[in-house]
């Protein structure tokens, strides 16, 4: 009996380390944990998740495979593999697992980490009604312009004529959120609203806690019972509860003042849709879905744009000659008696190229959002089993030496053609491509342009004498975020 048990255990152990036939090459699998020990060692060595993917690619090629805990993980680097994934329907899924369900009450809800009919219905609802509420319209632009003016006024007060250094790494958080929140909840927040400052700090912490592949909670879910603190479960639940409570309060306020004849925002429209679809068995419009949708938009809608703008200020500190050239262009094309508008975008070509180069060089979402294989398929000659989590290294795309020549160099001119126009590049994908392309791209582009141009139109950004020049090395996580830094803002007029 004992011998039989030992034989069975040995058989199961051997079975556990056998890779699927044709699976992409990668590090050795161990029983139970798969490649996890190698993954953690490599992460400790290189410091960032996206550099782990680059390390894998340099050893095994553009498509590499691991198993982390129970999860199959495939990482794609380089243009051909990434484009193939983003444009093929069989890779349009999102990972399913304990972590991905934890944030949405144990179910597959929201719009970011769903697929199939639920995702199609919710994405269609969001796009249709956000457009009606102003996405991509003059009213959206007016909202952002108002936020930019308020930010400038706040910075004038806080900077004391340029004498006082201001923390700049998170200065855009609330004004960026306000541009979205006006459409989502019909409300804007004061820039000094301490509750929002604290909540957005929690959002930043959540993004830094999360591993792009899903992390320990997804790969080894029992760890939440064995080591709740070490696995991140305790902190994550604390943060999520704070955000859930805020979103529920917002939705409850809408319910109390709901008027079916006066649709104020996306939450109202969702509540109306819930009423009209009550009798439909397969409708995805329910209470928890509304909270989950708000969670997705609240977190993803502010994080990447705010981080990009934080890095933009950092680049202007480190490259003062670029800052001066942007300001010269603003003075020449906009003048001093008005603020920049989106209509100025065509004439502010160097500024536009600077924003593109910031997005390329910083690559705020270096691993994108994870995809999932919806069926057994093949990628560049390798077998990808159904259910495999697929990560695309946008960092490898934006830092490819053969394509960019000098990818480590910050050089906005690479996006300007010989005749002075903006040069589009297929390798530049800050918002992705395909069906899973970022739904907030229009708002994000407008926000980046208007906040960045308005800031440099009104201030010169100088380093603080009290602290050394900051580094471009940011915090790791699902997104990269700038580490705390301050700058002096000198009024230009």
UniProtKB/Swiss-Prot annotation:
Catalysis performed (reactions): methyl (2E,6E)-farnesoate + reduced [NADPH--hemoprotein reductase] + O2 = juvenile hormone III + oxidized [NADPH--hemoprotein reductase] + H2O + H(+)
Glycosylation sites: 282, 458
Keywords of this entry: Glycoprotein, Heme, Iron, Metal-binding, Monooxygenase, Oxidoreductase, Signal
Superkingdom of origin organism: Eukaryota
Record comment: activity regulation: Inhibited by substituted imidazole inhibitors TH27, KK96 and KK71.
A Pfam short name: p450
PROSITE patterns: CYTOCHROME_P450 (PS00086)
Signal peptide (residue range): 1-20
Family: Belongs to the cytochrome P450 family.
Protein's name according to its UniProt entry: Methyl farnesoate epoxidase
């Amino acid at each position: 009996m004992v011998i039989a048990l030992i034989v069975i255990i040995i058989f199961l152990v051997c079975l556990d380390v056998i890779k699927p036939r044709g699976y992409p090459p990668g590090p050795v699998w161990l029983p139970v944990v798969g490649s996890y020990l190698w993954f953690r060692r490599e992460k400790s060595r290189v410091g960032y998740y996206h550099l782990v993917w680059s390390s894998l690619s340099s050893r095994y090629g553009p498509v590499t495979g691991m198993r982390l805990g129970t999860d199959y993980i495939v990482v794609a680097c380089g243009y051909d593999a990434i484009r193939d994934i983003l444009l093929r329907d069989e890779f349009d899924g999102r990972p399913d697992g304990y972590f991905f369900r934890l944030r949405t009450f144990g179910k597959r809800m929201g719009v970011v980490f769903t697929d199939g009919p639920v995702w199609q219905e919710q994405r269609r609802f969001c796009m249709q009604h956000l457009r009606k509420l102003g996405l991509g319209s003059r009213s959206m632009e007016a909202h952002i312009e108002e936020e930019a003016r308020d930010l400038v006024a706040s910075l004038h007060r806080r900077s004391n004529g340029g004498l006082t250094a201001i923390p700049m790494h998170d200065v855009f958080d609330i004004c960026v959120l306000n541009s979205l929140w006006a459409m989502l909840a019909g409300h804007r927040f004061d820039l000094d609203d301490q509750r929002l400052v604290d909540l957005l700090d929690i959002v930043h912490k959540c993004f830094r806690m999360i591993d792009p592949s899903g992390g320990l909670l997804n790969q080894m879910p029992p760890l939440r019972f064995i080591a709740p603190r070490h696995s991140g479960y305790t902190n994550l639940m604390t943060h999520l509860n704070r955000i859930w409570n805020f979103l529920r309060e917002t939705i409850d306020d809408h319910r109390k003042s709901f008027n079916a004849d006066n649709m104020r925002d996306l939450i109202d429209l969702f509540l109306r849709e819930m009423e009209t679809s009550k009798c439909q068995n397969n409708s995805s419009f329910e209470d928890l879905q509304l909270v989950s949708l708000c969670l997705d938009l609240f977190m993803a809608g502010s994080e990447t744009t705010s981080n990009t703008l934080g890095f933009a200020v950092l680049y202007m500190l480190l490259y003062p000659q670029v800052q001066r050239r942007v300001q010269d262009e603003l003075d020449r094309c906009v003048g001093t008696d008005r603020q920049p508008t989106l209509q100025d975008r065509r004439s502010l070509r160097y500024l536009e190229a600077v924003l593109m180069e910031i997005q390329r060089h910083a690559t705020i979402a270096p691993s994108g959002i994870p995809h999932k294989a919806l069926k057994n398929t093949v990628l560049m000659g390798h077998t990808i089993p159904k259910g495999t989590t697929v990560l695309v290294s946008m960092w490898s795309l934006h830092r490819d030496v053969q394509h960019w020549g000098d990818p480590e160099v910050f050089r906005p001119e690479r996006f300007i053609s010989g005749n002075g126009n903006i040069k589009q590049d297929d390798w530049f994908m800050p918002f992705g491509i395909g069906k899973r392309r970022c739904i907030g791209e229009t708002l994000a582009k407008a926000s980046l342009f208007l906040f960045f141009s308005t800031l440099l139109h009104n201030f010169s950004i100088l380093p603080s004498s009290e602290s050394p020049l900051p580094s471009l090395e940011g915090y790791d996580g699902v997104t990269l975020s700038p580490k705390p830094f301050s700058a002096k803002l000198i009024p230009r007029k």
